[in-house]
């Protein structure tokens, strides 16, 4: 059986090394990195399978449709509005307030994109509020949705490229490679969950993906910085031991940060309403796997592609002393 916690010769868990106190017993994360690779590869293959076979359930932001800017004479009941639209055969409407509780934006799929839809919607909603006003109707064509989809892809790729440049310049290119692999891991699995469940993807999902990228890279950079610091402090240990010590040191910070963030995101998921439901779900999945990948993927891949002490700390060059009189 593989042991994760290291003991000293007296059988006690190691809690201090070279004067460095550890919040937990020294944990040998790198021993199980291959199991982590297998789990990550399995999850990514399953995610890619669903993405290829089922595709995505694109929202109105990408497929086009009709957007209504409406004003109610009293506080609008969003659930009642959705129910009334469903009763009249309109599927997947997006109903949310804009500014005040009386101003409501209604978005309908492209299948309802015709010249008389405004009067139909008004007659439906007059059963909810007879004094309803439709201030404007905007038709969004599929070409606009295609441009938004391309923009979302470009934004994600640009973010990954900037992360690679930043980590590679501040630390080392092997860490940049590990970071990109970790971020791709998080994004693909999140996309796979949405594809498998056929959850609607809109622009808020894109915002969630970019947030996950930022959150995950922040966790990884904390680990990278601690690895570099320990390379300077501890000279006699191998690279793999330094990484285990660094991960053990940052584990409490990683757990506390992740748990507190997930509690807030869960509150958004359960109590935030339909308009941010998919956004918060993407954050839940992405942050959860991002925490895992910052421990078991990013630094592990950097190590396996050759990360060593000399890559993080340049060798000292002795200065020549001019002894001429």
Swiss-Prot record:
Keywords: Cell inner membrane, Cell membrane, Membrane, Protein transport, Translocation, Transmembrane, Transmembrane helix, Transport. SUPFAM superfamilies: Multidrug efflux transporter AcrB transmembrane domain. This is Protein translocase subunit SecF. GO terms for biological process: intracellular protein transmembrane transport; protein targeting; protein transport; protein transport by the Sec complex. GO terms for cellular component: plasma membrane. Disulfide bonds: none annotated. It comes from the Bacteria. It is found in: Cell inner membrane. Part of the Sec protein translocase complex. Interacts with the SecYEG preprotein conducting channel. SecDF uses the proton motive force (PMF) to complete protein translocation after the ATP-dependent function of SecA. The keyword Transferase does not apply. It is a multi-pass membrane protein. It comes from Haemophilus influenzae (strain ATCC 51907 / DSM 11121 / KW20 / Rd). NCBIfam families: 2A0604s01, transloc_SecF. Forms a complex with SecD. Part of the essential Sec protein translocation apparatus which comprises SecA, SecYEG and auxiliary proteins SecDF-YajC and YidC. One of its GO terms (molecular function) is protein-transporting ATPase activity. InterPro entries: SecD/SecF_arch_bac (IPR022813), SecD/SecF_bac (IPR022645), SecD/SecF_CS (IPR022646), SecD_SecF_C (IPR048634), SecD_SecF_C_bact (IPR055344), SecF_bac (IPR005665). Belongs to the SecD/SecF family. SecF subfamily. The chain crosses the membrane at residues 36-56, 148-168, 175-197, 202-224, 254-274, 281-301.
């Amino acid at each position: 059986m593989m042991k994760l916690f290291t003991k000293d010769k007296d059988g006690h868990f190691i809690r201090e090394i070279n004067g460095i106190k550890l919040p937990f017993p020294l944990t040998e994360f790198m021993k199980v990195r291959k199991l982590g690779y297998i789990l990550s590869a399995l999850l990514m293959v399953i995610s890619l399978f669903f993405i290829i076979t089922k595709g995505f359930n694109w929202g109105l932001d990408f497929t086009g449709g009709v957007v209504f800017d409406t004003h109610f004479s009293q506080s609008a009941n969003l659930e009642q509005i959705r129910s009334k639209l469903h009763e009249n055969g309109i599927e997947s409407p997006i109903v949310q307030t804009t500014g005040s509780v009386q101003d409501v934006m209604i978005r309908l799929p492209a299948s309802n994109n015709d010249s008389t839809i405004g009067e139909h919607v008004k007659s439906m909603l007059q059963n909810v509020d007879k004094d309803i006003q439709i201030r404007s109707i905007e038709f969004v064509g599929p070409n606009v949705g295609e441009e938004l989809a391309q923009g979302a892809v470009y934004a994600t790729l640009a973010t990954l490229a900037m992360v690679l440049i930043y980590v590679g310049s501040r630390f080392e290119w092997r860490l940049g490679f590990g970071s990109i692999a970790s971020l791709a891991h998080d994004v693909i699995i999140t996309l796979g969950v949405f594809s498998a469940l056929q959850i609607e993807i809109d622009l808020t999902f894109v915002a969630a993906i970019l947030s996950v990228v930022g959150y995950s890279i922040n966790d990884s950079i904390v680990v990278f910085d601690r690895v570099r610091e320990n390379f300077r402090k501890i000279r006699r240990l191998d690279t793999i031991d330094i990484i285990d010590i660094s991960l053990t040191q940052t584990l409490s910070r990683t757990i506390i940060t992740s748990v507190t963030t997930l509690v807030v995101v869960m509150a958004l998921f359960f109590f935030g309403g339909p308009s941010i439901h998919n956004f918060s779900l993407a954050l839940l999945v992405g942050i959860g796997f991002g925490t895992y990948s910052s421990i078991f993927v990013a630094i592990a891949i950097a190590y396996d592609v050759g990360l060593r002490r000399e890559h993080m700390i340049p060798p000292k060059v002795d200065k020549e002393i001019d002894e001429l009189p």
